């Protein structure tokens, strides 16, 4: 994967940019994953895992336990195997540090969840060749192509 020339992270992402990411990534490390089924991160992890992505939960508060049968890691560095995408369920101010960790482990994509964006993190990741998505949910984007036909049918 090659990084986009420049993307304004305050605007909509081109549909083909998001589609390419979601088609090409196989392994996703979710920073801020929760074992609490009432948390949004749990639902997103569940759907992405059931869709076929190799999900790796990362949460220092739950390290060593399991979420949906998946081992939880303390940090990205602790994973010890290739990761295509780092998805972030943390506050915007945590993103630059997570971007540095994503770069260090050789991730190809940094994806920040809805409501999470940070220009410094975007610049760091893009300068290192990562694709960057901010303020978007991969679960929503994964199913977006199906919305329009259904809406047109009144479903």
Protein language model features and the residues they cover:
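ADP-ribose/adenylate-binding Rossmann-like module
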Residues: 102-125
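NAD(P)-binding Rossmann-fold cofactor-contacting core
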Residues: 36-38, 45-67
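Short acidic, glycine/proline-enriched helix-loop-strand junctions
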Residues: 80-81, 119-142
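A charged, well-structured terminal subsegment
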Residues: 141-155
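Short N-terminal or domain-adjacent regulatory/targeting segments
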Residues: 2-24
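Glycine-rich, highly charged phosphate/nucleotide-binding loops
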Residues: 8-14, 65-81, 87-96
């Amino acid at each position: 994967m090659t990084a986009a020339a420049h993307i304004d992270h305050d605007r909509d992402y081109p549909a083909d940019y998001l589609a390419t990411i979601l088609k090409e990534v196989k392994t996703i490390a979710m920073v801020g994953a929760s074992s609490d089924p009432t948390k949004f991160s749990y639902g997103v992890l569940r759907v992405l895992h059931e869709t076929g992505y190799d999900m790796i939960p990362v949460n220092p508060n739950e390290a060593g336990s399991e979420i949906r049968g998946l081992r939880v890691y303390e940090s990205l560095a602790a994973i010890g195997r290739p990761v295509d995408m780092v998805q972030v369920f943390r506050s915007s101010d945590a993103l630059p540090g997570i971007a540095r960790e994503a770069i260090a482990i050789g991730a190809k994509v940094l994806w920040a969840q809805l409501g999470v964006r940070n220009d410094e993190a975007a610049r760091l990741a893009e300068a290192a060749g990562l694709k960057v998505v901010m303020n978007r949910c991969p679960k929503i984007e994964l199913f977006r192509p199906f919305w329009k036909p259904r809406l047109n049918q009144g479903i």
